[in-house]
């Protein structure tokens, strides 16, 4: 039996690696660089096309618990991320190019057959297993085949933030600080008074946007909502979103600014910064004009403009079984954002679940469902079995795990205990290599 993994993104790379080190014959299909997408810039595997942040490391945050669960699984992606971390307060952020380089290196050294070409359809095969992990930038031709196969798909749109050079920032205005003084001052802050905010706001809501083919506002996922759309929902909306000043004190005045634009390190060398929460579909000239209205960024050099792109996912509740296989073709699995999970590590988690069950099937064992007491189990239960027939993409969050008044540390403790027991029962750890994957880089 061969396992074909379609897409070398975060989930596809994780799956291919985990199955290969367990002795399965793995063929990884990736169309880049022979065919690029509108948002990818390199030929590396696991390229991060939106933020470089993998979110909070705190166990009190859902993403923190998810990371602990991935560590129990032995996640390659998380180990490489920690190896490529850049300072980001309580969050885990990475040097995106170094991260993708290291993942690519490991994949190429793991005995995986790599095929660089666009796959337009899945051929009929009675023996092989196929895992579709093509992600949010699935090619049009493959999406057409997929539409015929599942009878349903949906489109929504992602937007990414601009990146500027560090040496074009005016540090006499911009200052380092974390909210409430908690952290390592990893963020730069551009303060605004009310007049400056009003000027910025008026320019933003009146700026020209790029038309996006088939754009439907209702199918835009909230986290990547363009800043201009947030602004148009109300003049103060940005003050409760990406420009929230709460807990940030300007050392020049000793006071909290009216509004704050935050900048986060984009690489280890600290030569680049992304503008946090400034995903946009504005025309490039408009982006340049509006960014330079931000105090301290009057001479900002923009090395990547914000862009918006189509994002594809299936209605997993209708077409997948509890093990993420097609109901009408159990040789085809799905993983990653195409299933309706949202977020980098959420995609990895779905991939690990699929990999575990493909590994069990290869040993003639029955697939298993994850405990519902775990973050990963609750997330996948939501996308596979939610009561609403219309699936909206979902992040890991504690709300999936029961009443809001539950003690999060106790919930996390139970989740990790139950996952450890599950992984022991499933014999997952017995099949894997446990040494530090990135040793020697």
From Swiss-Prot:
Gene3D superfamilies: FAD/NAD(P)-binding domain
UniProt family annotation: Belongs to the MnmG family. TrmFO subfamily.
Class of this enzyme: transferase
GO biological process assignments: tRNA methylation; tRNA wobble uridine modification
Catalyzed reactions: uridine(54) in tRNA + (6R)-5,10-methylene-5,6,7,8-tetrahydrofolate + NADH + H(+) = 5-methyluridine(54) in tRNA + (6S)-5,6,7,8-tetrahydrofolate + NAD(+); uridine(54) in tRNA + (6R)-5,10-methylene-5,6,7,8-tetrahydrofolate + NADPH + H(+) = 5-methyluridine(54) in tRNA + (6S)-5,6,7,8-tetrahydrofolate + NADP(+)
Pfam families, sorted: GIDA
InterPro entries: FAD/NAD-bd_sf (IPR036188), MnmG-rel (IPR002218), MnmG_N (IPR040131), TrmFO (IPR004417)
Listed name of the protein: Methylenetetrahydrofolate--tRNA-(uracil-5-)-methyltransferase TrmFO
């Amino acid at each position: 039996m061969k396992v074909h993994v379609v897409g070398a993104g975060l989930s596809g790379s994780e799956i291919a690696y985990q199955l290969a080190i367990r002795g399965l014959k793995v063929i990884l299909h990736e169309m880049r660089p022979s065919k690029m997408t509108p948002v990818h810039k390199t030929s590396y595997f696991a390229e991060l096309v939106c933020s470089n942040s993998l979110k909070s490391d705190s166990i009190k945050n859902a993403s923190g618990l998810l990371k602990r669960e991935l560590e129990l699984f032995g996640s390659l992606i998380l180990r490489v991320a920690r190896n490529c971390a850049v300072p980001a307060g309580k969050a885990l952020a990475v040097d995106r190019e170094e991260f993708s380089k290291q993942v690519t290196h490991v994949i190429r050294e793991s005995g995986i057959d790599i095929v660089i070409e666009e796959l337009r359809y899945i051929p009929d095969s009675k023996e092989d297993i196929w895992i579709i992990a093509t992600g949010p930038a699935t090619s049009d031709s493959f999406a057409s085949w997929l539409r015929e196969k599942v009878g349903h798909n949906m489109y929504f749109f992602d937007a990414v933030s601009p990146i500027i050079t560090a040496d074009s920032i005016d540090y006499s205005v911009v200052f380092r600080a974390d909210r409430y003084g908690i952290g390592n001052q990893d963020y730069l802050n551009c303060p605004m008074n009310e007049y400056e905010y009003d000027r910025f706001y008026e320019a933003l809501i009146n700026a020209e946007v790029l038309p996006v083919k088939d754009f439907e506002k209702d199918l835009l996922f909230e986290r990547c909502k363009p800043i201009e759309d947030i602004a148009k929902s109300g003049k103060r909306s940005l003050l409760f979103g990406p420009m929230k000043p709460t807990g940030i004190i300007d050392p020049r005045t000793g006071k909290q600014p009216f509004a704050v634009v935050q900048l986060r390190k984009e690489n280890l060398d600290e030569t680049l910064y992304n503008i946090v929460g400034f995903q946009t579909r504005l025309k490039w000239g408009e982006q340049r004009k509006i960014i330079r209205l931000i105090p301290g960024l009057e001479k900002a050099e923009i090395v990547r403009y914000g862009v918006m792109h189509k994002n594809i996912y299936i209605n997993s509740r209708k077409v997948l079984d509890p093990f993420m296989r097609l109901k009408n073709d159990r040789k085809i699995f799905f993983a990653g954002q195409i299933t309706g999970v949202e977020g980098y590590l959420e995609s990895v988690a779905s991939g690990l679940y699929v990999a575990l069950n493909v590994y069990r099937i290869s040993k003639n064992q029955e697939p298993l469902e994850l405990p519902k007491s775990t973050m990963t189990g609750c997330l996948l239960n939501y996308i596979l079995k939610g009561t609403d027939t219309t699936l909206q993409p979902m992040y890991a969050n504690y709300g999936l795990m029961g009443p809001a008044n539950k003690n999060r540390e106790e919930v996390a403790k139970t989740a990790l205990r139950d996952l450890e027991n599950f992984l022991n029962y499933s014999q997952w750890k017995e099949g894997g290599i446990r040494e530090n994957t990135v040793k020697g880089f």
